[in-house]
Amino acid sequence: PWDFDYGNVLTVIGGYKFKFRESKWYQRFRESTIFPYISWIPFMVSDQLEISFRYSYSGGRPYTPKHYNFRYRSWFINPAEDLNTARYDYYSRLDIMILRRFNFKKINLTTFLDLHNIFDKNNVWEKMYLDNGSIEWAYQYKQMPVLGIIIEF
């Protein structure tokens, strides 16, 4: 197989947008004295609240196994063997994003929480062949939360 022949690839994306600004109960809540003190809470309602997800799956990426020569202390690929005869483990990742938008008179404020790799799966990036003849696995990043603020003028 070619270097990027994953076999199967699946990506599912979805989300929903809640428009609370148009609701009368939200307008009353926003004008209340308590709103400025609790609006920073991550899952608190806002003018617009978006919740979205992305799930990615792909079959194992092919690679060519290397052999270790103890005499020369080096790794090599046997030219008599076919290339890309082995595969890494499958790749799977679920990301979730929560976006909150606030509209003010002169600016718009957006806060977001983006959670990457919710399942905390060790997705293999590559095999690392060390000089001493051992093998270690290099993984892509595991769980990673990203927080952010966007200010629009």
Regions found by a protein language model. Give the residues of each.
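Gram-negative outer-membrane beta-barrel transporters
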Residues: 1-43, 48-58
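Extracellular loop and loop/strand-boundary signature of outer-membrane beta-barrel proteins
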Residues: 1-2, 37-39, 81-85, 132-137
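Intrinsic disorder/low-complexity detector
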Residues: 5-10, 97, 116-119
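C-terminal beta-signal and adjacent terminal beta-strands/loops
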Residues: 30-32, 42-49, 54-76, 89-93, ...
